[in-house]
Amino acid sequence: MKNKTKIIISGALGRMGKILIKETKKNKLIKLVYALINNNIDIKNHNQFYKVKEKKKFITLNNLKKKKKILKFDTIIDFSSPKYSIKIIKYCLKNNKKIVLGTTGFNTEQIKIINNASKKIPIIYSPNFSIGINIIYKILKNISKILGKNSDIEIIESHHRNKIDAPSGTALQLGKIISKSMKWNFKKSAIFSRYGNIGIRKKKRIGFSTIREGNTIGEHTVLFSNKYEKISIFHKAIHRSVFAKGALKAAIWISRKKNGLYNMSDMLKKIKI
């Protein structure tokens, strides 16, 4: 058996963190070293999810920083919040560790920090680690070039009621792929709000619609509509494990890479579409 990729999971008590920990048990190429939790979280409230053996791996970032012995791990997988993710990135910079970044909602300044960090450590960043949605990213490049000029383009996304950023990082990425393929300025093309007398639709526009309801994991639709036909590209995440499985594959992949900012498309380059 090959050497296992040793990981730390950040945001370990969140939705994705719990699933990631569960998926590490099934993956023979991954070894969980630690699971990061916030300082103000009481692990006792999560007893139903973890066995005693697992709970020994839980640690706060502050306590991780205090460890004098060099920790033998390869990569941190982070699904947390923008503010906490930046702390994780700074820790990885200081300790020369790789990072799989799945957090969304970063502002412009935080994106700059990520870009600068990638000059010194390997980072793979994706708003969506589903293999399926990343294949759609690849397909979308070609479809946009063929249909984009003469079509009205709309992106509709739906997520659970607790998601705090909108539109989703995946929806924004879909829009950016389309605008780049069409050589449009994304900031000018993106329409995030419609209300009142907005007039007729202008050319070179990408409309975004956001739905927040119930427990929806993630649904994304891209519409290309013209006077003759309508094409709809739809993706639905049925279980969050699809993101966890993709993130673990990314952790293995990034462990062999040099410094740089990567995405899932880089990882999937061998897939020809």
Curated annotation (Swiss-Prot):
GO MF, any single term: NAD binding
Cellular component annotations (GO), alphabetically ordered: cytosol
Binding site for NAD(+): G11, A12, L13, G14, R15, M16, G102, T103, T104, S126, P127, N128, F129
Keyword hit for Plastid: no
Record has S-adenosyl-L-methionine as a keyword: no
Class of enzymatic activity (EC top level): oxidoreductase
Catalytic activities: (S)-2,3,4,5-tetrahydrodipicolinate + NAD(+) + H2O = (2S,4S)-4-hydroxy-2,3,4,5-tetrahydrodipicolinate + NADH + H(+); (S)-2,3,4,5-tetrahydrodipicolinate + NADP(+) + H2O = (2S,4S)-4-hydroxy-2,3,4,5-tetrahydrodipicolinate + NADPH + H(+)
Keywords, alphabetical: Amino-acid biosynthesis, Cytoplasm, Diaminopimelate biosynthesis, Lysine biosynthesis, NAD, NADP, Oxidoreductase
A GO biological process held by the record: lysine biosynthetic process via diaminopimelate
Subcellular location: Cytoplasm
Pfam families: DapB_C, DapB_N
Binding residue positions for (S)-2,3,4,5-tetrahydrodipicolinate: H160, G169, T170
Documented EC number(s): 1.17.1.8
InterPro entries (alphabetical): DapB_C, DapB_N, DapB_N_CS, DHDPR_bac, NAD(P)-bd_dom_sf
CDD domains assigned: DHDPR_N
Active site, renumbered: H159 (proton donor/acceptor), K163 (proton donor)
Pathway the protein contributes to: Amino-acid biosynthesis; L-lysine biosynthesis via DAP pathway; (S)-tetrahydrodipicolinate from L-aspartate: step 4/4
Chief place of localization: cytoplasm
Oligomer and partners: Homotetramer.
Job of this protein: Catalyzes the conversion of 4-hydroxy-tetrahydrodipicolinate (HTPA) to tetrahydrodipicolinate.
UniProt-recorded name of the protein: 4-hydroxy-tetrahydrodipicolinate reductase
Taxonomic source organism: Buchnera aphidicola subsp. Cinara cedri (strain Cc)
Originating gene: dapB
